[in-house]
Amino acid sequence: KYPHEISAGEAQRASLARSLLTQPDLLLLDEPLSNVDQSFKEEIQVKLKKILSKLKITTIIVTHDSYEAFYLGHKCAIILDGQIKQFDDPYNVYHFPNSVEVVNFLNRGILIPAKVTGENSLENDDLGTIKGNFIKHYPKGSNVQLLLQPEDLEHDDKSNLKLEVVDRKFRGTNFIYTLKTNSDLLIPVFVHSHHEHQHEADEKFGIKRPINIDHIVCF
């Protein structure tokens, strides 16, 4: 094919291959796979990670795709307004964001109002008691914003805590439900796609009690 005959995704793949031919010590990739079809993207990410590791090429990848950053990066820097807001390994960036800005940027959960009721517990008007390990100490009675991520709540049809289903997205191995509380908070929840009872919009969705979160992140 001539250059004008190839797609944007093909052009990106060709550019990526050329950049690796010289086996540089340092490689800067700016949105390297943004135009690649999703069907090829994950396959290329796996191959790219293996090549970079084998050739020991230090690589800085600029991307807006957090999943891409989490998979390819040993370390992740969250940059907002020209400043590094957090620099850590991918696990900590996701599970222990250090600011509301980082939470909003990652868009992988919701902040809900809660009150600290004990050393390992807090209370939310809609969800009731939530228990877990605080990563930062807050005095009893403190009003906080609790980070609730999609994997923090468990589905239980027999529970008396019911939330309204607003939306359901199929993601292969999982469904992502969007649930509405009595105070109109919209909470995302993961459910395995093999679960027997899949809920439709406007149905009630049971949340397992007691709610236990491994690590409680508050602001």
Question: Which residue stretches match the model-derived regions?
Answer:
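ABC ATPase nucleotide-binding domains
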Residues: K1-E101
